[in-house]
């Protein structure tokens, strides 16, 4: 699996991900980029799950963003509708975290769209560790969103065997 974490604070949103690709108990690659910029660099997206499945979802989500002029929530809901009705999409095993200047969302493997409660989202095998670390840092420090995302991903990588210390970090300032 992997760990993807998104943190929003003080007009900044960040999505960070590790680089480990595992096949069973074997590390196949350590420097995969699981975080990308979409729609004219105005949307950030990260994935956890099967790599090929995630690329399919990235392509579909980017098409929805183009169709809906970059409106994040509408694009996510339309992708979720497709996910529930398209046989091929229903077999994909991946989750997306997407964010723009206004919202952060999780698009789940069941075709659900969830907006987080605390301006932070974490998915993947190390997601719970990253989320706990990020929430503690959000509530008890004045660190930036970038610093919180980086530190929480480091903590997840120290605990989760399917998460490494190679980081891809993208940020939007608005």
Curated annotation (Swiss-Prot):
Binding annotation for Na(+): 157, 160, 163
EC assignment: 3.4.25.2
Disulfide cross-links: none
Localization: Cytoplasm
Activity-regulation annotation: Allosterically activated by HslU binding.
GO-annotated molecular function: metal ion binding; threonine-type endopeptidase activity
UniProt catalytic activity: ATP-dependent cleavage of peptide bonds with broad specificity
Keyword Chaperone listed: no
Catalytic residues in the record: 2
InterPro entries per UniProt: ATP-dep_Prtase_HsIV_su, Ntn_hydrolases_N, Proteasome_sua/b, Proteasome_suB-type
One Pfam match: Proteasome
Keyword terms: Allosteric enzyme, Cytoplasm, Hydrolase, Metal-binding, Protease, Sodium, Threonine protease
Coarse class of the protein's main subcellular location: cytoplasm
EC main group: hydrolase
Gene3D superfamilies: Glutamine Phosphoribosylpyrophosphate, subunit 1, domain 1
Gene Ontology terms: biological process: proteolysis involved in protein catabolic process
Its job: Protease subunit of a proteasome-like degradation complex believed to be a general protein degrading machinery.
Similarity comment: Belongs to the peptidase T1B family. HslV subfamily.
PANTHER family noted in UniProt: ATP-DEPENDENT PROTEASE SUBUNIT HSLV, METALLOPROTEASE TLDD
Assembly behavior: A double ring-shaped homohexamer of HslV is capped on each side by a ring-shaped HslU homohexamer. The assembly of the HslU/HslV complex is dependent on binding of ATP.
Protein name, per record: ATP-dependent protease subunit HslV
Source organism: Shewanella putrefaciens (strain CN-32 / ATCC BAA-453)
Gene name of this polypeptide: hslV
